[in-house]
């Protein structure tokens, strides 16, 4: 937990500092030129997406709330946490074989994003499974615990770690032609994460019409 305390202290220092600023620009992820917005029938069709929302992390010792920006593809994940004023406090850039975390002016690297986050922060955040859960999908190792009156998944359990992760889909919304969660809660022991997706956009490579120059 010492890692967690140092990690959250660093982030809260950034948040407190941003409160002294009169102006703060909202720093978003760099553009990905080979991906364009698209419409899908269901979230599973989107091999890439980007979202804007909020993330809240709670433990018995600490609480953290921040804006969340995330661009996901099969080749890369780019995740940014910012304060309400738009000041960046954390960035994570990950591929299947490498991960780079920047927080409080320091850089950390590992071959695995999930292992890197746990080593630096003390949080065992399921970064590898979150892309499925964020889009309301059930993984091969997930067990459905409850469904709602419409047959939509309401709660799942993932037992890859002990204690297991329990994911509750609190509400849903239409985005990019699909139904995706609006709010979801993740719990594992005394660690709780809440996610709110204010905007979710499916992305894909733009199609080139016949006879049209690329």
From Swiss-Prot:
<dbReference type="GO" id="GO:0044874">
    <property type="term" value="P:lipoprotein localization to outer membrane"/>
</dbReference>
<dbReference type="InterPro" id="IPR029046">
    <property type="entry name" value="LolA/LolB/LppX"/>
</dbReference>
<keyword id="KW-0449">Lipoprotein</keyword>
<keyword id="KW-0813">Transport</keyword>
<dbReference type="InterPro" id="IPR004565">
    <property type="entry name" value="OM_lipoprot_LolB"/>
</dbReference>
<comment type="subunit">
    <text>Monomer.</text>
</comment>
<keyword id="KW-0732">Signal</keyword>
<keyword id="KW-0564">Palmitate</keyword>
<keyword id="KW-0998">Cell outer membrane</keyword>
<comment type="similarity">
    <text>Belongs to the LolB family.</text>
</comment>
<dbReference type="GO" id="GO:0015031">
    <property type="term" value="P:protein transport"/>
</dbReference>
<comment type="function">
    <text>Plays a critical role in the incorporation of lipoproteins in the outer membrane after they are released by the LolA protein.</text>
</comment>
<dbReference type="Pfam" id="PF03550">
    <property type="entry name" value="LolB"/>
</dbReference>
<protein>
    <recommendedName>
        <fullName>Outer-membrane lipoprotein LolB</fullName>
    </recommendedName>
</protein>
<feature type="lipid moiety-binding region" description="N-palmitoyl cysteine">
    <location>
        <position position="26"/>
    </location>
</feature>
<keyword id="KW-0653">Protein transport</keyword>
<dbReference type="GO" id="GO:0009279">
    <property type="term" value="C:cell outer membrane"/>
</dbReference>
<keyword id="KW-0143">Chaperone</keyword>
<feature type="signal peptide">
    <location>
        <begin position="1"/>
        <end position="25"/>
    </location>
</feature>
<keyword id="KW-0472">Membrane</keyword>
<feature type="lipid moiety-binding region" description="S-diacylglycerol cysteine">
    <location>
        <position position="26"/>
    </location>
</feature>
């Amino acid at each position: 937990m010492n890692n967690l305390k140092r990690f959250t202290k660093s982030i809260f220092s950034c948040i407190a500092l941003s409160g002294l600023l009169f102006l703060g620009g909202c720093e978003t992820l760099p553009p990905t030129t080979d991906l364009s917005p698209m419409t899908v029938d269901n979230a599973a069709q989107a091999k890439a997406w980007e979202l804007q929302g909020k993330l809240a992390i709670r433990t018995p010792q600490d609480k953290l709330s921040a804006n969340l920006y995330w661009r996901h593809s099969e080749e890369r994940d780019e995740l940014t946490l910012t304060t309400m004023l738009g000041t960046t406090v954390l960035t994570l850039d990950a591929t299947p074989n490498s991960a780079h975390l920047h927080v409080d002016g320091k850089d950390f690297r590992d071959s695995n994003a999930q292992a890197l986050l746990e080593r630096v922060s003390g949080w065992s955040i399921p970064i590898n499974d979150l892309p499925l859960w964020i889009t309301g999908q059930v993984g091969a190792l997930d067990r459905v615990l409850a469904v709602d009156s419409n047959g939509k998944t309401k709660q799942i359990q993932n037992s890859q770690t002990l204690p297991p992760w329990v994911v509750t889909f609190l509400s849903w919304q239409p985005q990019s032609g699909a139904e995706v969660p609006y709010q979801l809660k993740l719990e594992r022991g005394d660690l709780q994460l809440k996610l709110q997706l204010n905007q979710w956009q499916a992305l894909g490579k733009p199609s080139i019409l016949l006879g049209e120059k690329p």
